[in-house]
């Protein structure tokens, strides 16, 4: 029986994780939950999974949750400190890091320092503070397992192979809903259209990131830290069917790929059960029903966010943290209809150009870069 704490339990990844847990009561139990928005859903999760400790967005939410639960309730905390406490709580062996955005960094670091294995869905943890997190993983001898479908595919395709035999890793991208949309028409895209992803069901922020290709850019940075690969050994190919989740090319010309239906429960189940496997509940793949798999080069002129991510990775220092923070602010402004679709990468670019980079010496300095970028980007969205 593996004990889990889930950071971001009411989000898309959190819900899929609990669905996998629900299928395997003999394998997994939930000791901690943290969420930021949906108190009613969290209350239902608490009643079903009976965790020992939970965290919510703020003190007011904690009061509302206590009222809903009555006398039988777990320890209830709030804020970043509360989520960090859930991540570090005794009793859990693995922490599923699925809080959206840079807000997931501090709780994930807390979990690593407490010696918890990490199932990482929060790519921003590595984008913002990749060097720090990598060093902490080694220091505390924990296992970091990717939950992103692309990185899970690479992890599986690397199994049993030597690093020196790798030619490059290839991340696949669906291309989003606008891969055939002209640059002029992209200027007039609104949130309603951008939130309709052709393959995946995800939360609003990551769906917009997928439409701009920023999500793929952040995944490039994540792959660098997960697999210790330089930028010039990480490629991206558009694969609209989202059946091949990513690939590894070896020096002999052979390519290993992982295929499956586009359902996040598969990489989640793989991370939870590793080094074993367990039933995920996804639809089994039938290639004869799909018929054709196609591939294209990404267009970095129409979708400059991907280029910005490569630039940030190559520049290093605090640039990835700044890119991520500026993008989060711009996406929120787009969803609020304050800016246009093409303004999202433009604001990220302008924020990076205004940044004076430095090499962070600790968590506080990464967070300072994040705050600076948010403040700077906000001035561009008003």
UniProtKB/Swiss-Prot annotation:
Its EC number is 1.1.1.267. Mn(2+) binds at residues 148, 150, 219. It is an enzyme of class 1 (oxidoreductase). It catalyses: 2-C-methyl-D-erythritol 4-phosphate + NADP(+) = 1-deoxy-D-xylulose 5-phosphate + NADPH + H(+). The keyword NADP applies. Keywords: Isoprene biosynthesis, Manganese, Metal-binding, NADP, Oxidoreductase. One of its GO terms (molecular function) is 1-deoxy-D-xylulose-5-phosphate reductoisomerase activity. 1-deoxy-D-xylulose 5-phosphate binds at residues 123, 149-150, 174, 197, 210, 215-216, 219. Catalyzes the NADPH-dependent rearrangement and reduction of 1-deoxy-D-xylulose-5-phosphate (DXP) to 2-C-methyl-D-erythritol 4-phosphate (MEP). PANTHER family: 1-DEOXY-D-XYLULOSE 5-PHOSPHATE REDUCTOISOMERASE (PTHR30525), 1-DEOXY-D-XYLULOSE 5-PHOSPHATE REDUCTOISOMERASE, CHLOROPLASTIC (PTHR30525:SF0). This is 1-deoxy-D-xylulose 5-phosphate reductoisomerase. It comes from Chlorobium phaeobacteroides (strain BS1). The gene is dxr.
